Amino acid sequence: MLLFLDANVLFTASISPDGTSRALVRLSAEGACRLAASPFAIDEAQRDIAVKREGSLAALDAMLAYVDLVADAHPALSTWAGRYVAAKDAPILAAAVGARADVLVTGDRRHFGYLFGRAVHGTRIEPPRDGLRPVLDQVP
């Protein structure tokens, strides 16, 4: 199962070692799932951490060893994704769909919340706790 991580999930996983977002990284390290993020998502997470929790940049760098880097989406795909989410979030949705992720995991309820539990072009959008559930269901 491939889970695409939004910048806010990367941020939260970096600053909260016991949270749900970090649990996804641990499960990926154990081979229970694959995680992916785009340069756009990683850059946003790095900027936010540098401003708000600079001491957590090392944690993000360590976690990225378990996250596949996928390409940013073509601008045309981002334009298409803008039909579903705000323009600033369209590159995230577009990259997740372009990577053929099973799930886009995001904590952004304001912009993605109305899509939680729904699929957009084959990629289901879920908050971290719900994104974790199918991974745990696969673990023996």
Identify the function of each model-found stretch.
Residues 40, 61-83:
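Acidic catalytic patch
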Residues 2, 104:
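Hydrophobic "anchor" residues on beta-strands that sit immediately upstream
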Residues 4-5, 17-51:
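PIN/NYN-family metal-dependent endoribonuclease catalytic core
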Residues 39-40, 107-109:
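Short secondary-structure boundary segments
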Residues 83-86, 90, 97, 102-103, ...:
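Acidic, PIN/NYN-like endoribonuclease modules and their adjacent C-terminal/linker elements
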Residues 42-66, 133-140:
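Extended, non-globular alpha-helical segments
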Residues 12-14:
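Short N-terminal binding/cap micro-motifs at the start of the first secondary-structure element
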